[in-house]
From Swiss-Prot:
Annotated Gene Ontology cellular component terms: ribonucleoprotein complex; ribosome
Gene Ontology biological-process annotations: translation
Keyword terms of this UniProt record: Ribonucleoprotein, Ribosomal protein, RNA-binding, rRNA-binding
Species annotation: Pseudoalteromonas atlantica (strain T6c / ATCC BAA-1087)
Assigned protein family: Belongs to the bacterial ribosomal protein bL9 family.
Gene that specifies this protein: rplI
Protein name per its UniProtKB record: Large ribosomal subunit protein bL9
Source organism phylogeny: Bacteria, Pseudomonadati, Pseudomonadota, Gammaproteobacteria, Alteromonadales
GO molecular function: rRNA binding; structural constituent of ribosome
Pfam family membership, one: Ribosomal_L9_C
């Protein structure tokens, strides 16, 4: 099925690209999320008329993500206090939700889906480098310190 992408889609293309995808992927995922439209003659003409508006919107989202990345870079570190045993093993774990809440409390709005933990939840005290995927093109790193709760 021929479609026109309305924004950047991983492993497919960018704004305005005419691509061929399986019809189920288009109907069940891309169309409902507003990421694509069928490549009919009428839709191609409509898209060309709105291209500048869509490009400006994408540039605005990218600029906002870069501004948030700069704010994250200004934060030296974020500290989370969690109950732990004598050897530094946590009673429970620190996950993406906890990290997002701690960064938001420090002054930078972060969603839990933007926090990337490739090794899973953190289960011990110490210092960790946490990657944040703020936009498809913008990533940031923040230092997270987990301390034993008094």
């Amino acid at each position: 099925m021929e479609i026109i992408l309305l924004n950047k889609v991983a492993n497919l293309g960018g704004l305005g690209d005419n691509v061929t995808v399986k019809s189920g992927y288009a109907r069940n995922f891309l169309f409902p999320q507003g990421q694509a439209v069928p490549a009919t003659k009428a839709n191609v003409e409509k898209f060309e008329a709105r291209r500048a508006e869509l490009e400006a919107k994408i540039a605005e989202q990218l600029a906002a993500a870069e501004a948030r990345a700069a704010k994250v870079a200004e934060l030296a570190e974020v500290t989370i206090a969690s109950p732990a045993g004598d050897e530094g093993k946590l009673f429970g774990s620190v996950g993406t939700r906890d990290i997002a809440l701690a960064i938001t409390a420090a002054g930078v709005e972060i969603a839990k889906s933007e926090v990337k933990l490739p090794t899973g939840t953190l289960r011990e005290t110490g210092e960790f480098e946490i990657d944040l995927q703020l936009h498809s093109e913008v990533t940031a790193t923040i230092k997270l310190v987990i301390i034993q709760e008094a």
